[in-house]
Structure formats: structure tokens, C-alpha cells
């Protein structure tokens, strides 16, 4: 699905991500792909380029591996923090597997065990966790709420490897189910639960069930609002990262089909780790691999003729640290010119 905001007429699409820099309305950029294809390097590099043309940029990793800290050589956590050497580019790392316990704890001192000592705490947690993905949904909703209040001009998500990448799209439904179950519990047992909780010191932060339900409702509204923005091609796009191999191409196609079904714009693909052995190269393995890569590159070009396809070379060293990331990021904008084959 290509964005009408980007593509017009019969223009051939540039093999760069320059269009993302030119799209001034863009607010949310998701970078996703199979593990090990250079997704984090690509998202960091894109963030560096966007920081050149935007007032404030936030890079968020939702990958539990937390590779942003490794990429920049700087520790990040769940609070947004400026990246060394930049005055308008910040980063944060959150764990989308964070627990619903944080919501129940309301940030109190007992966050590690908000239900400690409460006989029916386990029952509430069992109820909440019986809904698949509810803990991730709550955690992600809290992050989106925080991000909304931070008012960054553009936000880039370095997502978890494919499979988990698109789970955020199901969150509004998951939250509605959770809300429905808890509302049902509250209407049936609310007075009794509140009196028992009151006798035992209540929930952490002095909350009762109604307050928890109200908090969940406000989170559901926030995530519903953001979800509507995700479906607006002027505000949101998804950059697919892959390598020229069968499994990676298969995952990319599956992801693009899913994004299309969710009405989320995607019109850029970054193909990493391409080999370009010279004519006189004596490396037979390199030539064989290049032959295989060319086959899948041709398939990518046929399948995604209405996409900006960026070809990135295999590098001899890891892309870590500000200088190497900046160098890599330049190739996302100025196409790499390989030696003659």
C-alpha cells in the first residue's frame, strides 16, 4: 500500500528514504523486520536524519533486547533521555512485556508486589492475565500516554522482531475485553470487594476498583485515539527492513499484507547486508551469495514496484557509535553506488 501523499503520477520512486524527511506531516514512524536484519541500525540512522529536519525527535525501542543502548554506546531507560551529541534527538527503551501490576500499583512504593498480602489480589491478576496480551496492552498504553504528553514532533519506534511487531494494533480490542471483564466483576462483586479491600488496607495508592476501571478507560481512549492516527498515511508510516533471502522476504510480504489489512501506510523497504563483489574478486562464496541476493532483489523490485526500495551494502565492521551511525544514515538518503560487477 503506497501513500498517495508520497507517490504521484508516473514518477519512478527514488531508492532512498528522502521522502520521509520531506513529509512534514509525519508524526509516527515504525521500523520493523525479522531479527538480525539491521532493524535497530536502520531506525537509529533514520532518527539521526529526521533530527536534521525536525525540531524534536524521539526514538523508542519496544524490543526487550534493548539494542539502542548498544548502538549509541549510552544507557537508556524508560524515561526519554537526550542522545549524546544531539540537542533534539532523545531515546527511551521500554519493555512491552511490562506487567499490569504497574497500573494497579499506580507508581507507589509497592510496585513490585502491589497485591502483596491481599487474598483476592491473585484473583484479580488471574482475571486480568486471562486475556491474552493484556499486560503488553496496558504497558504500551502507558507509554503512548507518556509520549503524547512529551509533544515530540516525530516519534520513531524500533519495534520487536516480526511476530510481535503488529501486536499494538490489537491493543484497543484487548483493552476493551479487559475493561468488559473487570466491569462485570465490579458490578457483581464490587461492593463486597471494596469492603474486603478496605478492611485489608486497600489497593496500593489507596485506589478502589472503580478508580482502576476509570484509569483503564482513560488508557483505552488514549490508545484508540493514537490508533486512529496510525491509520492516517499523512501521520504514520511503517518502514520494512529485510535482507535479500527467502525467509526475510517471506516475513516482509506477510508483514506488508498485515499492515495493509490494518490500513497502515507502508511504502519504504530497506534491504540490508547486500554484497557487491568487484569483477576481479576471487571470492567464490561472495559471488555465489551475490547471485542469490540478486534473485531476491529482483523479486523485491517486481513485488514492490510502488515502494521506495533502499539497497544497503554489507559492511566490514559493526555500525555502533554516533559516527558510524551517521555514516550509515547518509546512505539511507544518498543511494550507495556499488562498484561495477
Swiss-Prot record:
Coiled coil: none
Ligand binding (Zn(2+)): 283, 286
GO biological process entries: cellular response to oxidative stress; pheromone-dependent signal transduction involved in conjugation with cellular fusion; post-translational protein targeting to endoplasmic reticulum membrane; response to heat; response to metal ion; retrograde vesicle-mediated transport, Golgi to endoplasmic reticulum; tail-anchored membrane protein insertion into ER membrane
List of residues binding ATP: 34-41, 245, 272
A GO molecular-function descriptor: identical protein binding
Enzyme class: hydrolase
Family matches, as CDD domains: ArsA (cd02035)
Active-site residues from the entry: 63
Family, as annotated: Belongs to the arsA ATPase family.
Stated name of the protein: ATPase GET3
Gene name linked to the record: GET3
